[in-house]
């Protein structure tokens, strides 16, 4: 702030008042004072806007960093022969998602004025005149794009190790350009039919569905889309034996899984607290130093407690069920707790977040047992984790949302959590959200995946799947075990029959790893 232009000059003001005692001088002095106060007010408004915009940009950077977390998590969860493929698909999700969200997705999500189903204002397509609108800036687009590609990244994990590259390109563009934006319009836009932020206060059940940072909008959308794709494709070769018993196809690197988990954990502090969009906003004038910045801190705490509780619950639960301590299960449990708390992170107490994480862990364990029983194959447990825990998170918000926090964030006297004495209206809205998300994603992504399947554009051949896509589709392995694995010095046929060196001898022999 330029203090020279916002500070009254005592010399100038003294000269005006001492030169004459008539009303003209008094008016001049008053005009001078008012102009200075106006300048100060404008500067403070600019500063507030700049701080809020910087906060949103920083949050967008954190959410985007989650893409690296997704990439590492996916890479570690698949077999070594498909590492390059899955990392390339994560890059593709971000790149294709950026173009489709820029051209169509952002307008479908937040184009206003519009109807309750989908945004349609022309100025939002390709950001044609978006920044010229009052209160809008490019930072909001960047933040929402980071959310959109997160949903696409979730889906890629469910269909890993058996999907053609062109299918990734098609589904990623469609999901980020149409399917996800429509859902985000319903629940986050000021015009959305079920949004808790509707400008006309014509709210679903008098409350709207509270999905603060996207347990449903992001996690359920990505998880259900992945479920559709995995069901159409079927399990990976070797995932179940001839008698139908489950065969573990373990990922090749627990180190990458842990690295990816910590990167996602770090990014979640932009995902959840960043969803306030602004930070310089006061709440209760009777409480000094209390405002939106306090709610941001509380949201970070509830996010942390839910994830950590889910991780610990999964650790001991899986020890009892499986007889060993499994770091992969703990990482997935942690992420399940984060996915669940994302809906109500801003409107619940810290103690309630512990309840959320505890239940989320068992939701994930239960859905994994069900998936095994139904012979459903999801290499990253994405549908169970994001879809199942995301649905629990929406229900949790309907049960535990606190009245004071709901009224701070959403205007008016709203219904709040059932277990907090607020009745069942909010819970009803949350259940409606679960139903419509499952229905919408199923009727859009299901036919897309089925159409790709019928056109032979979805699943790779059995030969490619057995050999590994790194070799057959991407020109080499992600790891060079020794000089003989350097494809730059050997013809392709030398490697066609082997994917990974065995550990039984110092000289690798041709083997197929499933």
Curated annotation (Swiss-Prot):
UniProt record similarity statement: Belongs to the ammonia transporter channel (TC 1.A.11.2) family.
InterPro entries the UniProt entry points to: Ammonium/urea_transptr, Ammonium_transpt, Ammonium_transpt_CS, NH4_transpt_AmtB-like_dom
Transmembrane segments: 56-76, 91-111, 140-160, 165-185, 212-232, 257-277, 291-313, 328-348, 351-371, 380-400, 431-451
GO cellular component: plasma membrane
Keyword Membrane: yes
Protein name: Ammonium transporter 1 member 2
Function: Ammonium transporter probably involved in ammonium uptake from the soil.
Organism lineage: Eukaryota, Viridiplantae, Streptophyta, Embryophyta, Tracheophyta
NADP in keyword set: no
Tissues where this protein is expressed: High expression in root.
Membrane-related topology note: Multi-pass membrane protein
Pfam families: Ammonium_transp (PF00909)
PROSITE patterns (UniProt xref): AMMONIUM_TRANSP (PS01219)
Keywords, alphabetical: Ammonia transport, Membrane, Phosphoprotein, Transmembrane, Transmembrane helix, Transport
Location of Phosphothreonine modifications: 472
Localization (cell): Membrane
């Amino acid at each position: 702030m330029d203090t020279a232009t916002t500070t009254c000059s005592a010399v100038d003001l003294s000269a005006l008042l001492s030169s004459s005692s008539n009303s003209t001088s008094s008016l001049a002095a008053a005009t001078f004072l008012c102009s200075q106060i106006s300048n100060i007010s404008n500067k403070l408004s600019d500063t507030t806007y700049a701080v809020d915009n910087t906060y949103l940009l920083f949050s967008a950077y954190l959410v985007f960093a989650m893409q690296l977390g997704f990439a590492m998590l996916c890479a570690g969860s698949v077999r070594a022969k498909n590492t390059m493929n899955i990392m390339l698909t994560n890059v593709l999700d971000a790149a294709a998602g950026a173009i489709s969200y820029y051209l169509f997705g952002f307008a479908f999500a937040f184009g206003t004025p519009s109807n309750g189903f989908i945004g349609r204002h022309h100025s939002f397509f390709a950001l044609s005149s978006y920044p010229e609108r009052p209160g809008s800036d490019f930072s909001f687009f960047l933040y929402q794009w980071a959310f959109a590609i997160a949903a696409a990244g979730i889906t890629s994990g469910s269909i890993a190790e058996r999907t053609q590259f062109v299918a990734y390109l098609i589904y990623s563009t469609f999901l980020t350009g149409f399917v996800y934006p429509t859902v985000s319009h319903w629940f986050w836009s000021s015009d959305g039919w079920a949004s808790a932020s509707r400008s006309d206060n014509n709210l679903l059940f008098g409350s709207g569905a509270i999905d603060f940072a996207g347990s449903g909008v992001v996690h359920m959308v990505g998880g259900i889309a992945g479920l559709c794709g995995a069901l159409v494709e079927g399990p990976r070769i070797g995932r179940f034996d001839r008698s139908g018993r489950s065969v573990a196809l373990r990922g090749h690197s627990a180190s990458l899984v842990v690295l990816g988990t910590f990167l996602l954990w770090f990014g979640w502090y932009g995902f959840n607290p960043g969803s306030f969009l602004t930070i310089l906003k006061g709440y209760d004038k009777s409480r000094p130093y209390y405002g939106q910045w306090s709610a941001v801190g509380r949201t970070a705490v509830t996010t942390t407690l839910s994830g950590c509780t889910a991780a610990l619950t999964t650790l001991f639960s899986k020890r009892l069920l499986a007889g060993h301590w499994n770091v992969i299960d703990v990482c997935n449990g942690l992420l399940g707790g984060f996915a669940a708390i994302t809906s109500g992170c801003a409107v619940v107490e810290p103690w309630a977040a512990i309840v959320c994480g505890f239940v989320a862990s068992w939701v994930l364990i239960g859905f994994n047992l069900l998936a095994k029983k139904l012979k459903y194959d999801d290499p990253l447990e994405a549908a169970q984790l994001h879809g199942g825990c995301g649905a629990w998170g929406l229900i949790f918000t309907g049960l535990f949302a606190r009245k004071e926090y709901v009224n701070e964030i959403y205007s008016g006297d709203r219904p709040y959590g059932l277990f907090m004495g607020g009745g069942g209206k909010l819970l009803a809205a949350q259940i409606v959200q679960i139903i419509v998300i499952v229905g919408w994603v199923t009727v859009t992504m299901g036919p897309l995946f089925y159409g790709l399947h019928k056109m032979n554009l979805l699943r790779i051949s059995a030969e490619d799947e057995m050999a590994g896509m790194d070799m057959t589709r991407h020109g080499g392995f992600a790891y060079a075990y020794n000089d003989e694995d350097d494809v730059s010095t050997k013809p392709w046929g030398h490697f066609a029959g082997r994917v990974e060196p065995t550990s039984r001898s110092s000289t690798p022999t041709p083997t197929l790893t499933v």
